[in-house]
Amino acid sequence: MVFKLAHALLKARPVEGFDLKDFLDLVALATVADIVPLVKENRLLVRHGLKRMEQTQHNGLRALMEVAQVKGPLTSADVGFRIGPRINAAGRMDRPEDALEALMCNANVDPLPLAERLDSHNRDRQAEEQRIHKDALKCYEEEHHPDDPVIVLGSRDWHPGVVGIVASRMMRRFHKPTFIIAIDEKGIGKGSGRSIGGVSLMDAINANREHLEAGGGHAMAAGISVHEDKIADFRNGFADFVTENVSAEDRLQRLHLDALTAGLLNHLDSEPANLALDEPA
């Protein structure tokens, strides 16, 4: 959005010597890291941005690539799984200004310590994620029946910055729509949800507004605010919604198989790819 706005302004009032293409590496970084659908113009911008990122002139990004041990030719997976998480970890661990400082540092600042700080945040995030995931698995075994159509878990010992990642892992492991909720000292839970095909989290949220303080997102990923005392009511309402609106057959996990051909091998090299334009497999 910012890139398109800048493009429109420069068309109206050109600035001599200013080339917006110099920022395509940051456009690619932001687009992939934020899981923006890689379709139409987004795909084109990311494709050219990845090429420019290999010779980036942005000191902070270059240092971050060094710390992440990312080398060309770059793919969307390099950004999505190695560079992006280190930037996002700063916000997840309550230090978003560190990511901004690293990306905006000029030639007079040594960017390596800033990049290493982001790498440290990412290691902290990974440790916290592992701890919460292990705890969530234990809670699931204690609180849920295997036939339950949904997973809704909450704790005062969980960090709100990583509940979305844990929700994704739980959803993939059990193939059930999942909300993981971090509860603060006032008893207000901030939850992150991830869903399976056929189950819209927004429809489920709208059907259970009476149990929630707030909720928003889209069909496959959403966030909620819920009082600790209402989590059980929300879990029951969420389960009822899924049972009543989505058949058990539609909730089955499906494996799509295809033939391996020369054309498919060429297709496997297609870049970039992400959630909206799946990586060929």
What annotation goes with each model-predicted range?
Residues 252-254, 259-281:
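Accessory interdomain/linker segments of ATP-dependent helicases and helicase-like nucleic-acid enzymes
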Residues 1-4:
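Short, glycine-/small-residue-rich phosphate/pyrophosphate-handling segment
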Residues 239-245, 249, 275, 279:
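Secreted, periplasmic, or luminal enzymes acting at the cell surface/secretory milieu
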Residues 11-231, 240-244, 256, 260-263:
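Hydrophobic helix-and-loop "lid/oligomerization" segment in the mid-to-C-terminal part
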